[in-house]
């Protein structure tokens, strides 16, 4: 399995996190979780090792991120792509340079391989016309697409998406989901509103609120609006 949480609660848990969270995500699956922003962001912080759980256990790619030394946390994060809130793009760098950053920080990758990977996502995500522009000057939908491309440029084993498609149209959402699944092994996406396209493309859909975490199955209609 890629991810396993067992009876997890964070320190200073938000009001909505009333019950311990248990969750298992298998390899090459796509999970969508309908939740509120604070729960999604805290969950991803636990997965990325940015905070330790107050109780329970977190296993990510066979590692306990909250217990790892800093260098090993960085190594684990190099295998995880993410689009969080805010998106973390560097506004005064070009799109091309933003795409290069996660590869530059990855050890052992030569310049030719960096360029090959960047060109691959530039072509797939349709970014050629904006590669020299800066994210600070892009509309919201284009910026979200750049953030997705940057998250998958390293072909991560796990991709974390925190409500990443809020500014993107329905047709484009379906295309971007397919690209994320192509470049990343396993995807976990949160959404803060009803998103039928996400639900329809997911292997599993869940609802998580103050009542707890519960599976909603595969049918988009089972998730309340």
Q: What are these language model-derived features?
A:
Residues 56-66:
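Conserved ABC transporter NBD signature motif
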Residues 65-81:
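ABC ATPase NBD coupling module
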Residues 86, 93-105:
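Q-loop/switch helix immediately C-terminal to the Walker
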Residues 113-130:
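Conserved ABC ATPase "signature" region
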Residues 151-152:
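ABC ATPase C-loop
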């Amino acid at each position: 399995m890629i991810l396993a949480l067992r009876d997890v609660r964070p320190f200073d848990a938000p009001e909505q996190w009333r019950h311990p969270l248990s969750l298992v995500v298998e390899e090459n699956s796509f999970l969508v979780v309908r939740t509120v922003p604070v729960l999604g962001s805290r969950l991803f912080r636990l997965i990325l090792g940015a905070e330790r759980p107050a109780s329970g256990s977190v296993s990510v790619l066979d590692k306990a991120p909250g217990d790892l030394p800093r260098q090993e946390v960085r190594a684990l994060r190099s295998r995880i792509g993410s689009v969080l809130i805010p998106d973390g793009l560097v506004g005064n760098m070009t799109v091309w340079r933003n795409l290069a950053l996660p590869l530059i920080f990855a050890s052992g990758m030569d310049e030719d391989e960096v360029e090959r990977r960047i060109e691959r996502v530039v072509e797939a995500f349709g970014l050629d016309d904006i590669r020299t522009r800066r994210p600070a000057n892009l509309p919201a939908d284009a910026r979200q697409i750049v953030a997705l491309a940057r998250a998958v440029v390293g072909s991560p084993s796990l991709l974390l998406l925190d409500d990443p498609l809020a500014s993107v149209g329905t047709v484009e959402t379906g295309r971007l989901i397919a690209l994320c699944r192509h470049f990343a092994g396993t995807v976990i996406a949160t959404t803060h509103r009803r998103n039928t396209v996400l639900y329809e493309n997911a292997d599993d859909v869940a609802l998580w609120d103050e009542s707890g975490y519960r599976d909603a199955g595969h049918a988009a209609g089972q998730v309340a609006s």
